[in-house]
């Protein structure tokens, strides 16, 4: 299924998400919508604090076909606050959830493409700098993750002209750009610039716009 069709399907479903929702029913509606696709959904719980419009965490992973019992799939888990039996979703929250799901699917489809391009080959690990958070730097610095996070920004419809001042892009505008700026802009500028170029490349292919220069302020 094309990613554009997936976006339309998710946005159509999100129109019915506002209000107090029965979680199993919400998951079931998503799985029914994607029953002929490799995407599947489940629900989990979390205990951390959250914002009213960002109260559902979305995690995902791609798994290539292992056997007849474990087919190729993209698994998406929606994490709901443990304190509530039902999901309470605001209008803005429904929009945010739709973007997060679409973004996760974009990300995992990119991993699918990566594996098909070079099966069973892993990328070289990123070596964190002395003052970096080791786990975050190794995760975001991995070449496959950098490419997939850049690719997922298409789901946010990020205006690539804003990359001239990427250091001003907020978490709400693009989580990936925000996290790569926070992790690499000062600690390892080469990775930050490499990421921005990937975002620009994917964004330009989506919008068909002409090339613009990334401002030196991002360096």
Please annotate each region the language model reported.
Residues 99, 115-145:
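Post-HEXXH active-site segment of zinc metalloproteases
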């Amino acid at each position: 299924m094309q990613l554009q069709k997936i976006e339309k399907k998710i946005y159509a479903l999100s129109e019915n998400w506002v209000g107090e929702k029965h979680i199993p029913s919400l998951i079931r509606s998503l799985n029914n919508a994607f029953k002929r696709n490799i995407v599947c959904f489940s629900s989990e719980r979390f205990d951390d604090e959250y914002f009213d419009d960002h109260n559902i965490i979305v995690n995902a992973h791609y798994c290539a076909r292992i056997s007849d019992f474990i087919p190729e799939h993209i698994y998406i888990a929606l994490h709901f606050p443990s304190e509530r039996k039902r999901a309470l979703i605001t209008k803005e929250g429904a929009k945010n959830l739709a973007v997060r799901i679409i973004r996760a699917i974009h990300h995992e489809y990119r991993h699918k493409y990566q594996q098909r391009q070079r099966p069973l080959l892993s990328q070289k690990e990123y070596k964190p700098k002395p003052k970096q958070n080791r786990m975050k730097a190794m995760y975001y610095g991995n070449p496959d993750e950098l490419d997939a996070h850049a690719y997922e920004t298409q789901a946010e419809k990020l205006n690539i002209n804003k990359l001239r001042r990427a250091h001003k892009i907020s978490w709400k505008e693009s989580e990936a750009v925000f996290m790569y700026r926070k992790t690499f802009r000062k600690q390892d500028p080469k990775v930050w610039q490499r990421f921005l170029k990937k975002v620009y490349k994917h964004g330009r292919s989506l919008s068909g716009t002409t090339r613009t220069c990334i401002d030196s302020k991002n360096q």
